[in-house]
Each structure stands twice: as C-alpha cells, then as structure tokens.
From Swiss-Prot:
Any Gene Ontology biological process: cell wall organization
Membrane topology: Multi-pass membrane protein
Alphabetic keyword roster: Cell membrane, Cell wall biogenesis/degradation, Membrane, Transmembrane, Transmembrane helix
Protein name: Casparian strip membrane protein 5
Keyword Transmembrane: yes
Residues annotated as transmembrane: 35-55, 85-105, 118-138, 172-192
Subcellular localization, as worded in the UniProt entry: Cell membrane
GO CC terms in record: plasma membrane
Main location: membrane
Extracellular compartment spans: 56-84, 139-171
NCBIfam families given in the database record: A_tha_TIGR01569
Cytoplasmic side of membrane: 1-34, 106-117, 193-197
Pfam family, one: CASP_dom
Length: 197
C-alpha cells in the first residue's frame, strides 16, 4: 500500500514538482496472526463441544418406573458398545485439543513458523477422522433408537426412553459441531501454509 504526500522542501523531487512516495511498512504476521488467534478460539470451542458430547453421552441413563419380578427396564450408554466407543473417542479428542493449545499459542506468537502448523494439521486430520467415525456410528444407533428397523425386528425404544434418546441425540449433535470445527481448523491451517506472504 502506498501513499503520496506533497511536501515542500529542498529535495530534488520536491523541486521538480514530483510527488514523494512514502510506503508504510506492513506489520509482520499480519493476517496470519489473525488466523492463528481464530485457530486458538476455535480450539476452545471444539474442546467444549467434545467434552459436552462425551459428558452428555456418558451421563445418559434412564430407568422406566415399572419393572417385573425378573426385569428392570433401563437404558444407558454402556448398554451399547457404539456409545462406549463414542464416549472414549470424544474424551480422546477433547484431550488432544487441550494438548494442542500450546502449539496454537506458538502459532499466534510466531505466525510465520510453518512447523507447528504442519504438525497441527496432521494431527487435526487424524482426530477429525476419529471424531467423524464415532459421531457417525453413534448417529446410526440413535437413528435406530428413534425409528427401529422392521426388517430385523428392532423396535424403536424412544417412545419409552424419551430422556435417554434426547441426551444421546444431543451428544451426537455436539460431536458433529466438533467435527465441523476440525474441518475449519484444517482449512485455515492449509490456507496459511499455502500462502507465502
């Protein structure tokens, strides 16, 4: 960006009647620093989403108020191995995001350093895959809980276990928010690594 300023003086350019060009130096870091700050903020949001998903699913439990002599009707996350996988993977994703915060801070302090960003983009891709797999598998079980499957004689349980289904659905939505944030983090890091200036 350049600016022209007419200044009367004794310089040769001023005597010749030509405008003097003055350039303002660009700030080091510039837009890359802004992207790094946004990266840090998005990581905090993804931590909240992943922890919320793991906690909501882990605390999902409902017991029906009636029972027989031999059976008590209960639904909890540990009744489904897919939900157990979901809780473990979302806890791992949240743990990774917490451990990635120092590298994100390094990217804010040194916006032109490519090493931390490259390391983060590789690990973000790994944990994006893990979060997507656990979210999608839990979503399929939640769908079956809501709708059942008549071909296999699986009945929908959400008519009886409404609170349980609401909690598990909320956990799946929260995990998909974390997946969306991971996608944004990867795209932002790729843009910063792809631009030279």
């Amino acid at each position: 960006m350049s600016t022209t300023i007419d200044m009367p003086g004794s310089s040769k350019a001023a005597k010749a009647g030509k405008p003097v060009l003055v350039t303002t130096p660009s700030r080091p870091g510039g837009w890359k620093k802004g992207v790094a700050i946004m990266d840090f903020i998005l990581r905090l949001g993804a931590i909240a989403a992943a922890l919320g998903a793991a906690a909501t699913m882990g605390l999902s439990d409902q017991t029906l108020p009636f029972f027989t002599q031999f059976f008590q009707f209960e639904a909890s996350y540990d009744s489904f191995t897919t939900f157990q996988f979901f809780v473990i993977t979302m806890a791992l994703v949240a743990g990774y995001l917490v451990l990635s915060l120092p590298l994100s801070i390094v990217a804010v302090v040194r916006p032109h350093a490519a090493g931390p960003r490259l390391f983060l983009i590789i690990l973000d891709t790994v944990f994006l895959t893990l979060a997507t797999a656990s979210g999608a598998s839990a979503a399929s079980i939640v769908y079956l809980a809501h709708n059942g499957n008549q071909d296999t004689n699986w009945i929908a349980i959400c008519n009886q276990f409404g609170d349980f289904c609401a909690q598990t659905s909320g956990a799946v939505v929260s995990s998909l928010v974390a997946v969306l944030v991971f996608v944004l983090l990867i795209v932002m890091s790729a843009l910063v690594l792809g631009k030279k200036h």
